[in-house]
Design a protein with these regions (language model features):
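Bacterial N-terminal signal peptides that target proteins for export
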Residues: 1-10, 43
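N-terminal signal peptide c-region/cleavage motif recognized by signal peptidases
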Residues: 16-17
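N-terminal "mature-domain start" segment
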Residues: 22-59, 136-140, 147-150, 201-241
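A mature extracytoplasmic/lumenal domain signature
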Residues: 32, 41-43, 49, 78, ...
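Soluble non-cytosolic domains of exported or imported proteins
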Residues: 34, 116-120, 185-189
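Short, solvent-exposed coil/turn segments at beta-strand boundaries
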Residues: 38-42, 67-71, 150, 171-178
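Surface-exposed amphipathic alpha-helical segments
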Residues: 43, 94-99, 103, 125-133, ...
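Conserved polar/disulfide-associated segments of primarily extracytoplasmic proteins
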Residues: 51-165, 169, 239-242
């Protein structure tokens, strides 16, 4: 009996240790793409392209990891060069063709931009969301939300084919689109650790935490000043403000 108990105890310890090891996630950070998030293992990086709502083809990267408990990915689409593409398109348009030219100058440039490039930035979160809604899914949650005070869209979907669940957070920061996607099998718990770990980093890898909500369509486009970072003094109020 002693030997049996020892074997059982040893087996239990080994199984527990294996279970803990299996649950150890790593924090992954990428300074070039400006984000940090936890993955269950070192993510695979795939260079790809993303076609925008206005038809621009932009560089993108997919960071992905997979385990028996689900598939986890972060897609980053770089919109920072889209204004140049918009100018190139606008210059090739027939004279007076506003639907092609957009607004390369004038009062509506900050809204529409050359070749509708600025409007494409403003539309990026909605368009990425729409692409998911076109799939064979049932929407069970669709909210405005924020992660690290950067606004975005939060969705939960049930995939019709196998009843797996997809959890999404789609945001935009400094004119880069972030699509955080976790899909788990039917009956599995929500991937809370992955969902809640998203953060944004600067070119030196320092975490970015604002004092107020960051909205890319205003702050990324510099229509409004970027909110101060945590630990910085708040901006001075205009004269006469209270």
């Amino acid at each position: 009996m002693r030997a049996t108990r020892f074997v059982l105890a040893f087996t239990t310890v080994v199984m527990a240790a294996s279970s803990v090891a299996a649950q150890e996630w790593i924090e992954y950070q990428n300074k070039d793409d400006g984000f940090k998030v936890v993955f269950p293992n070192e993510p695979k990086i795939t260079d790809t392209v993303w076609t925008t709502e206005q038809g621009y083809v932009l560089p993108a990267r997919v960071y992905s990891a997979e385990t028996s408990s689900g598939r986890y990915s972060m897609t980053v689409v770089d919109y920072t060069g889209i204004e140049r593409l918009g100018m190139e398109r606008s210059q090739k348009c027939p004279v007076g063709a506003e639907t092609c030219q957009g607004q390369p100058a004038g009062g509506l440039r900050p809204v529409i931009g050359p070749g509708y490039a600025t409007q494409d930035i403003r539309d990026a979160i909605v368009y990425a969301t729409f692409k998911y809604l076109q799939k064979d899914v049932r929407v069970t949650e669709y909210l405005w939300n924020w992660q690290d005070l950067v606004e975005g869209h939060q969705l939960q979907l049930t995939n019709t084919a196998d009843q797996s669940r997809t959890y999404l957070y789609i945001s935009m920061h400094e004119n880069k689109l972030y699509i955080q996607d976790a899909t788990v099998p039917k009956g599995y718990p929500e991937p809370g650790l992955f969902q809640q770990s998203l953060g944004y980093v600067d070119k030196d890898g320092n975490g970015i935490r604002y004092q107020a909500i960051y909205s890319n369509e205003f702050h990324g486009l510099r229509i409004d000043p970027v909110p101060p970072l945590a630990g910085q003094p708040p901006p001075a109020l205009p004269a006469g403000a209270r």
